[in-house]
Every structure is written in C-alpha cells, then in structure tokens.
C-alpha cells in the first residue's frame, strides 16, 4: 500500500479516533508531510520503538504502540509467560502515561497480567520491578536523550535488562507480523 492510500485509510477508517483524523486533515495540502508520516511503519528495533509523536504509521501514537504491544504479547504467549505479567513504567514525556495505558490494555486483552506504575518512574526502577515481581517482561515509555517531540517504547526481559539477541529479533518478527490487535477499552 502506498503512502497516500495509508493516509486516506487513517483519515477515513472507523478504528481511528477523531483527534487523529483532525490532525491528519490539517496536513492534507502538505504532501511531503503526508509522505514522511506514512511512507513506512515506525520500526521496532533492537530496544523497541522511538519516533516523533503524531498521527501516522511512521510516528509514535496509540496505534503504533498498540501494534508493538500486540507483537510483544504474541511473543509472551508463545513463551507461556502470561501469568508472570509485564511491568510498565513511563517518564515525563508528552503522551507517556497514555502510551503506558495503551500497552496495558492491549496486554490485558491478551490475558497477560500487568503492573503499571501510577506516576513517572526512572528506567532502573522498572528493571528492578521486573526482577522483584518475577515478571516475564517490562516496558518503559521513554525517548531517553531524544528531542522533546519524540517518545519511545523500550522492552526489558525477565532478567531486568533490555532485550538482546536472539529475543530482540524474535520479538521484532512478531511485531512485523501483526495484522490485528486485541484491545480492552476502559
């Protein structure tokens, strides 16, 4: 699917909220902006996702976060780790609490227990919590050192460390293979 088709799908699709559609309609005359937002999917790399916050497949938003979380959920289910749960932390960046909630709702819809912090926490506290609670994984919503318009999504495994080979590649494969997501509404 070409970037203009993806743009139209996001502008008209029933699954996309009005706020997302309004943001995209605001750029309808700016083809270079549309192309930048839709020419590819935001890549789930070795440590997770990182990108500019906004509407589009190449941006950090609730839809790309949910897709990444669905891939992680699929991997956890294959490992039979749903009962161990996933700890979720977030920093002070824009949309961090919302993205952490999106991740929890997706994991819960897949039958995976979650432990989500009520307020912002540093990454080392997430790492400690994963080990202390015996979780199979952890997620931190943070863009670390990137500019303020960015946010990110980092995955940690049951040892409290960021995912490394071969798990990173296996999770990336699951994320890239997502065609549908499970989601629980509040």
Regions found by a protein language model. Name each.
Residues 8-103:
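An N-terminal, well-structured beta->alpha segment
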Residues 184-185:
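Conserved small/polar residues in nucleotide/adenosyl-binding loops
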Residues 52-53, 149-150, 164-166:
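Short helix/loop capping segments that flank catalytic or ligand/cofactor-binding pockets
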Residues 1-3:
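Polybasic, low-complexity association/targeting segments
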Residues 8-13, 81-158:
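Ferredoxin-reductase
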Residues 91, 174-177, 181:
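N-terminal segments that mediate ammonia production and transfer
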């Amino acid at each position: 699917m070409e970037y203009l088709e993806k743009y139209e799908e996001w502008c008209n699709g029933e699954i996309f909220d009005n706020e997302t559609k309004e943001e995209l309609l605001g750029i309808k005359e700016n083809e270079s902006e549309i192309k930048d937002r839709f020419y590819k999917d935001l890549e789930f790399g070795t440590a997770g996702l990182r990108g500019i916050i906004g509407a589009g497949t190449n941006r950090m938003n609730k839809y790309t976060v949910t897709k990444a979380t669905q891939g992680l959920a699929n991997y956890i289910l294959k490992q039979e780790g749903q009962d161990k749960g996933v700890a979720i932390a977030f920093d002070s960046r824009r949309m961090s609490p919302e993205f952490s909630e999106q991740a929890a709702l997706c994991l819960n819809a897949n039958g995976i227990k979650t432990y989500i912090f009520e307020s912002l926490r540093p990454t080392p506290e997430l790492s400690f919590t994963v080990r202390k609670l015996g979780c199979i994984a952890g997620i931190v919503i943070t863009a670390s050192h990137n500019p303020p318009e960015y946010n990110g999504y980092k995955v940690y495994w049951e040892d409290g460390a960021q995912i490394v080979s071969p798990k990173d590649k296996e999770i990336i494969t699951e994320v890239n293979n997502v065609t549908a997501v499970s989601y629980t509404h509040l």
